Amino acid sequence: MFKRLAVSCLAVTMATAPALAHFQELLPSADVLAQGGEVSLDLVFTHPMEQGPVMQMEKPARFGVVTKAGKTDLLGRLEERKIDGKSTWRAKHALQEPGGAVYYVEPKPYWEPAEGKFIIHYTKVVVDSFATGEGWDEMVGLPVEIRPLTRPTGVWTGNLFRGVVLKDGKPVPFAEVEVEWKNDGSVKAPNDAFVTQVIKADASGTFAYAMPRAGWWGFAALVEADDKRKSPEGKDVPVELGALMWVKATDMGARK
């Protein structure tokens, strides 16, 4: 009797436990380079608020940068790094001209058997070279993408970040946006409800979120692809498309 009860309780717990939010990280060494120079970018597929686990990430389908000079393919600059035995990637890129640099990645589809779907998170982040405050709203032209309405560089902690969720260049009404902080180990969530913040875009696809703590914040607008893909078992399964953008919040320091 006790054994059957224990098994039943475990089944209920597993059924009601919230699914961990996957986030494609694309994190630069700095969001603003006051004197320009080299930026290092780390690409990891993980659960940022919970500091893992790290998922296997194959070499991306696309990786590049958009500047005022146009679009540049950086796929050849990626170097594989292993974390907990899983593939992650790192690239270095020199910014010699002033203005915004919009880095982006299209990962290869990730099969998530626990959710019965593929995941493709189109991710971008902006680095401001020479602190010009320009070029931050350049669009990459990804299948799903966040159009920032707030400059995503030089942002103070507590500032409101606003954006528009786009699919095929058109706003997505009432899109669901998941938000997570890149945990540096200093915060433990009271329970699972605090791990991933969830907000809804309005009828025009616009969302807003005030970042309460310094560090990197990931915004993941999730929509379902129009077409399905074949699972490893040969079944037609849905594809989750994520429009991700990373924004860094910085505390106001005292004047020295």
Where are these regions (language model features)?
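Sec/Tat signal peptide C-region and signal peptidase I cleavage site
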Residues: T16-A21
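Short, surface-exposed beta-strand/beta-hairpin micro-motifs centered on an aromatic residue
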Residues: R90-H93, S204-A210
